[in-house]
């Protein structure tokens, strides 16, 4: 029903045409209309003219996303719920059941969203992109961290293009605007030593999050696209653009390896050439961030030489 109304945009669609195309009765049509109105859609009903969509709520439901998708597989199979504890958890369950590569779990709100190192990820309703994608790359487990960097490149390129904002990458999994975090990327996997079974790639983006929804302790370190851009953004369009770019960059990674990703990552990183402190398992290391190793490790130039940093919190 919604797809038909969206086709006509501001024009009326007759009950007769709806009945014919959906092969349903006028009574069934009215039930569909009432359900859509409950979900926040404003639909005008006019005698002898039919039905017209007047207002669409900001939702990331499949019927809002699919008309904009331009991918081969990413997002073509989708699980959507209004509110979930965590899209990562649902995606893991789906992957264990055999979900195909490109399967997407997406929601309007998370009540128990998680970031890197099991930190809380605040996911207020109807204001962000909270999604998890199932991947099945034919790579060894040791190369899986490269997928976080690959996704960082794809999302950064998309957000720069679609919003005009100067989005930069902070190793290993954050995207920043003006030094504040707007996106986090979380890569989790199941596999054996020589082969990844599946990867769940989680992406959380503060899109239309307002200052009221940012916890006090995050005000100085987090922001949103709307706050920085001074306007709101259509989340379905952003999601479709991200999935298209991500699919293309991912396929390029599988075909050509990590080196092209490494070059693109270094071009988009806002931390290279700066003095940083890396909190490593061996203790804090201070030095200049100079690039990425072929493995995806961050290269830190210190007084002792250039060191690869594999897992760390970074302070700039």
Descriptions of predicted regions:
Residues 3-4, 15, 20-21, 101, ...:
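Catalytic beta-strand/loop module used to bind and position nucleotide/cofactor moieties
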Residues 1-160, 233:
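N-terminal lobe of the biotin/lipoate ligase/transferase fold
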């Amino acid at each position: 029903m919604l797809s038909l109304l969206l086709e006509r945009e501001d024009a009326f669609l007759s009950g007769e045409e709806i009945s014919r195309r959906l092969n349903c009765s006028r009574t069934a049509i009215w039930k569909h209309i009432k359900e859509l109105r409950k979900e926040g859609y404003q639909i005008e009903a006019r005698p002898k003219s039919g039905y017209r969509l007047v207002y669409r709520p900001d939702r990331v439901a499949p019927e809002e996303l699919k008309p904009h998708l331009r991918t081969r597989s990413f997002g073509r199979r989708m699980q959507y719920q209004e509110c979930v504890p965590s899209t990562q958890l649902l995606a893991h369950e789906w992957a264990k059941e055999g979900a195909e590569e490109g399967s997407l779990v997406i929601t309007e709100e998370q009540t128990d969203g998680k970031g890197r190192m099991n930190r809380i990820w605040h996911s207020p309703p109807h204001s962000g992109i909270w999604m998890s994608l199932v991947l099945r790359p034919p790579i060894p487990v040791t190369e899986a961290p490269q997928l976080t960097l690959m996704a960082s490149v794809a999302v950064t390129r998309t957000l720069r293009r679609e919003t005009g904002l100067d989005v930069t990458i902070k190793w290993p999994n954050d995207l920043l605007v003006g030094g504040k975090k707007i996106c986090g990327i979380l890569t989790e996997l199941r596999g054996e030593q020589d082969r990844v079974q599946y990867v769940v790639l989680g992406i959380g983006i503060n899109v239309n999050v307002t200052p009221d929804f940012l916890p006090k302790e995050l005000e100085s370190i987090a922001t949103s696209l709307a706050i920085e851009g001074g306007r709101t953004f259509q989340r379905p369009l952003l999601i479709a653009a991200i999935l298209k770019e991500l699919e293309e960059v991912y396929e390029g990674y599988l075909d050509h390896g990590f080196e092209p990703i490494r070059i693109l990552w270094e071009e988009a990183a806002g931390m290279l050439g700066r003095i940083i402190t890396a909190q490593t398992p061996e203790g804090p290391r201070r030095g200049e961030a100079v690039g990425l190793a072929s493995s995806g490790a961050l290269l830190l130039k210190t007084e002792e030489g250039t060191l690869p940093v594999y897992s760390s919190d970074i302070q700039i």
